[in-house]
Amino acid sequence: MPPKVAPESSDAVSSQEQPQRPPPATPPVPTPPPGRREEVGDRAEDPILQRLESLTALLRSERSAVRVTNASFETGRPALQPTADMRGDVTNMYNRPSTDSLWAVKPKPISNNMATSEDMVKIKVALEGLGVPTEHITGIIYQMCFYCASTSSSSYQDPKGVFEWPGGAIMVDDVMGKVQEIAGIRRVCRLYAPVTWNYMHIHDSPPSDWASMGFAPNVKYAAFDCFDYVENPAAVQPLGGVIPRPTRDEYVAYNAYKLIVLNKANNNDTYGNFSAQITGGRMGPTIEHNFNNANNKKQ
């Protein structure tokens, strides 16, 4: 029978059953991130460097190869917001309009001495009825205005010839007859006076009768019948503008000739009645003007 072993104490058993615990780990020592300056002197230079970089960026933003001078921007500026007592009442006839309200009403050039848009539409429809293709009607109107520049825009003229387009033609009498019936030849020619003016200068083609009308070579284009409407803003404007502008000498020459012609045509206006008892069957006396003292100098 084997010998009995003495029982171990409870403390020894418990010490054998429990595992050995490792010693506590030493906490890691934090290391500074790379590039971090630990010196006090280096940390003091950071604000100065930032200011230097900010100044550099500011100077770069201010430099430019473009510099706007004499700036004045009225169009597109922010609209003012008047106070309630200054907004006015637009329903009151005595309301005082502001500058912005006047600016909102755009001007529309208009002249009662030239053909209106409605007149031109009626002329277009009438010429279509005579057989002129729609796409060539504007060209026919141009031809009529160029024709009248050398003849006359008077309704009493006896026109000759035809106006042509590719594949067709129409008698000048028919075109001018319809234009006179609807709007008047002179009123239509005035509407296209700037276009005719540019056309004559592009082709170096002044009115044919300029010499017989008494115009000097330097003002020969003033013999144009509708010269006084070349700079009218209500007329049809060339795409490139009116070139060249009429000169002062041309205005003087045109108005002088216009006065002479009107006096010659209006000699019967001296009569208050055209009955034979008044006129005696004769034309009125010639209206004369003394131009010698026009410049306030006796000659």
Curated annotation (Swiss-Prot):
PROSITE patterns, per database record: POTEX_CARLAVIRUS_COAT
Signal peptide positions (record): none
Biased composition (Pro residues): 20-34
Cell compartment(s), UniProt: Virion
Entries under InterPro entries matching the protein: Carlavirus_coat_N, Pltvir_coat
GO molecular function terms attached to this record: structural molecule activity
Biased composition (Basic and acidic residues): 35-46
Region Disordered: start-end pairs: 1-46
Main subcellular location of this protein, as a coarse class: virion
GO cellular component terms given for this protein: helical viral capsid; ribonucleoprotein complex
Keyword Ribonucleoprotein set for record: yes
Keywords: Capsid protein, Helical capsid protein, Ribonucleoprotein, Virion
Entry similarity comment: Belongs to the potexviruses coat protein family.
UniProt protein name: Capsid protein
Organism: Helenium virus S (HelVS)
Phylogenetic lineage: Viruses, Riboviria, Orthornavirae, Kitrinoviricota, Alsuviricetes
